[in-house]
Structures are given as structure tokens and as C-alpha cells.
């Protein structure tokens, strides 16, 4: 009787502790985005190309679906991560990510970096090798950018979003003979090296623009997500950030 009661009490204690542990873990693992400020560094997709209005951008939608207090949108259409060899007065030529990340506001709670598709699409910087540390090659620019962001925001979550699939992205680019996946792989590897969390939309966005029905539904021009595509990004980003 005594031992049976002890066993019962032990099981009850374990259940109680397990419940408390689960609640503790849930609180520990859940990031409350309400009231936060997020810096978004990106290209035309971040800027909102393809959407019908500002409110339909995935960045702005984070206010609606996650309660984010302030969105700082540093998206500039056409920009690349790496510096260009031929620089013009066009914004997309002179404002690569490595050049402009340092000008972002310092007081962000979360930083989100979303780029690489333009490096594949029309960037003239050499692809380089993973040992590069210069912003003049794509591989080097990934290192330069990630390390620079960590130094600027040493205690804040820095999230990397891979490029989305785009139409015909298995075709090697003319200058370097690289597919979009080659660029994505460098971004993944660089993020892993610096222990930055990756929202891998190349692998898990669920949209392949080479399939006409999905292209029509989510990115009619084969590259820029429409309103439905932006909401899909926002929902995935919310879930990802909350789990950090």
C-alpha cells in the first residue's frame, strides 16, 4: 500500500513537472512578435514589386498577422548582394547589400535578409569561391554581409531567406554558367557557417513558376510574387520567426 502510494505520487509528480516543463519550453521557444521592430534588407520582392498595394507586401502583412509594431523596408529593386564590376548611377547598381546594410536603423528587434536572385539574374560580379571574403565576388559578399550584420546586431536574431524559385532557374546564367541553386547553396552554407537561421523558401515555398498553374496563381511574371504569393511568404515567415 505504501509503495503503491509512492508510485502514484511519483507518477503524479512527474506529470506535474512534465506539464510545467512543456509550458516552460513553449514560452522559451516562442518568440512574441507583437510590438517588435523588424528591418528587412532585400530587393524588388521585399520592396513590393508584383503586389497591388503597400498593404499586400509580405513585409507590411507582418503587422496584420503577427502584430509587428514597425516595419523598416530596405528593399531596393534590382539590387544584388555582391558589388558590381560595372557601376552606373542606377540605384540597383550602386546600392548592393554589402554597401547599404550599415545604414539600417540600429534598434531593430529582428533583421531579415532576403536576396540573391538578382546576383543570378543579372549580376556581373564573379561567382568566386567560398574562401573569398571580399564583397566583389558573390561568395565573398555573402561572408562580408553576414559577418557585418552580426557585428552590427550581435544580440539580435538575423534571419536569412533564400531566393524563391523563378521561371527557368535551372538555366545557367550567361556570365558565370551558374544556376540559381548554385547561389542558394552558397547562401545556405554561409548562413550555416555563421549560425544564422535560414527560412529556405527555395526548398519549401511550395511554388514552382515553371508550372503554369502555379505561376498564374502566385507569380504571374515568373519572378515577383503577387498578393497571394506575398501572403504565403508572410505566413511562413511568421511561423518561422515565432519558433526561433
Task: Describe the role of every protein-language-model region.
Residues 1-41, 45-72, 104-107, 151-156, ...:
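N-terminal secretory targeting modules
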Residues 32-39, 45-140:
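Conserved SGNH/GDSL esterase-like catalytic core that processes O-acyl groups on lipids
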Residues 93-244:
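Alpha-helical cap/lid subdomain in secreted, periplasmic
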Amino acid at each position: 500500500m505504501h509503495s503503491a502510494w509512492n508510485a502514484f505520487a511519483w507518477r503524479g509528480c512527474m506529470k506535474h513537472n512534465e506539464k510545467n516543463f512543456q509550458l516552460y519550453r513553449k514560452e522559451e521557444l516562442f518568440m512574441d512578435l507583437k510590438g517588435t521592430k523588424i528591418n528587412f534588407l532585400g530587393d524588388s520582392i521585399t520592396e513590393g514589386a508584383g503586389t497591388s498595394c503597400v498593404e499586400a507586401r509580405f513585409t507590411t502583412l507582418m503587422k496584420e498577422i503577427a502584430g509587428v509594431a514597425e516595419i523598416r523596408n530596405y528593399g531596393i529593386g534590382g539590387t544584388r548582394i555582391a558589388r558590381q564590376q560595372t557601376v552606373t548611377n542606377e540605384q540597383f547598381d550602386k546600392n548592393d547589400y554589402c554597401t547599404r546594410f550599415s545604414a539600417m536603423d540600429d534598434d531593430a528587434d529582428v533583421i531579415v535578409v532576403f536576396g540573391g536572385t538578382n546576383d543570378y539574374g543579372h549580376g556581373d560580379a564573379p561567382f568566386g569561391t567560398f574562401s573569398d571574403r571580399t564583397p566583389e565576388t558573390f561568395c565573398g559578399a555573402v561572408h562580408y554581409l553576414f559577418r557585418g550584420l552580426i557585428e552590427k546586431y550581435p544580440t539580435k536574431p538575423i534571419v536569412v531567406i533564400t531566393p524563391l524559385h523563378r521561371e527557368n532557374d535551372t538555366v545557367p546564367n550567361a556570365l558565370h554558367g551558374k544556376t540559381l541553386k548554385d547561389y542558394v547553396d552558397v547562401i545556405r552554407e554561409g548562413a550555416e557557417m555563421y549560425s544564422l537561421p535560414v527560412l529556405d523558401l527555395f526548398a519549401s515555398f511550395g511554388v514552382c513558376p515553371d508550372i503554369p498553374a502555379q505561376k498564374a496563381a502566385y507569380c504571374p511574371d515568373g519572378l515577383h510574387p503577387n498578393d497571394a504569393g506575398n501572403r504565403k511568404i508572410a505566413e511562413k515567415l511568421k511561423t518561422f520567426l515565432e519558433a526561433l
